[in-house]
Amino acid sequence: MTNDDVLDEFRAAGALREGHFVLSSGLHSPIFLQKNLVFMRPQRCERLCKALAEKIIATVGQPDVAVSPAVGGIIPGYETARWLNVASIYVEREGGSFKFRRGFHLEPGQKVVMVEDIVTTGLSSRECIAAIQEAGGEVIAAACIVDRSGGKVDVGVPLVSLCSLEVPAYPADALPPELAAIPIEDPGSRRLRG
């Protein structure tokens, strides 16, 4: 599956948006990928995650388990794990850091692929990887549907992405004038508290 194939899935779902967005990282961007509109259709999610699973195996080999960060990584993590024929578990934020809960755990030395939806700065990926390593897992790779950094982000392990884009993202104090002139939308989820 090519970058264009992945973007076609986002376009078909109405999930490739243009405007002025505050991402969950806190950065501002003229492009937002509304992944939930993609993942709400099982057939679309299946196509993307099957291709991601194939790329994981071709790149780093077969993992023993897939671990994802809640909430955004749960659906692609589960579907990718299905195609890898491994268990899918996730970590949740507790006290500001990711922890294994709900009876989820790793066996020491298990080969783990960390599966995300979209990576921009890699913060959630690095935090999830740290939780996996703390629990005794061996992280053989991180994987995502879309890498918005164009391959520049460093998560500390190989990053396998189905689609790599170089999408501009800016701190609030360094916005280009054309982006600053557009009203802000804040679709990110990291700051939401239930």
Swiss-Prot record:
Q: What pathway does the UniProt record associate with this protein?
A: Pyrimidine metabolism; UMP biosynthesis via de novo pathway; UMP from orotate: step 1/2
Q: Which residues cross the membrane?
A: none
EC number per UniProt: 2.4.2.10
Q: Which cofactor does it need?
A: Mg(2+)
* Amino-acid positions noted as binding 5-phospho-alpha-D-ribose 1-diphosphate in the UniProt annotation, renumbered to this chain: E116, D117, I118, V119, T120, T121, G122, L123, S124
Q: Name one Pfam family in it.
A: Pribosyltran
What keywords appear on the UniProt entry?
Answer: Glycosyltransferase, Magnesium, Pyrimidine biosynthesis, Transferase
Q: Which residues form the signal peptide?
A: none
Main enzyme class: transferase
The Gene Ontology biological process annotation of the record reads:
'de novo' UMP biosynthetic process; pyrimidine nucleobase biosynthetic process
This enzyme catalyses: orotidine 5'-phosphate + diphosphate = orotate + 5-phospho-alpha-D-ribose 1-diphosphate
Q: Spell out the molecular function terms from Gene Ontology.
A: magnesium ion binding; orotate phosphoribosyltransferase activity
Highest taxon in the source lineage:
Bacteria
Which positions are annotated as binding orotate?
A: T120, R148
Family membership, please give it. Belongs to the purine/pyrimidine phosphoribosyltransferase family. PyrE subfamily.
Subunit arrangement? Homodimer.
Fetch the HAMAP family from UniProt: PyrE (MF_01208)
Function as written in the Swiss-Prot or TrEMBL entry: Catalyzes the transfer of a ribosyl phosphate group from 5-phosphoribose 1-diphosphate to orotate, leading to the formation of orotidine monophosphate (OMP).
Protein name per the record: Orotate phosphoribosyltransferase
Its gene name is pyrE
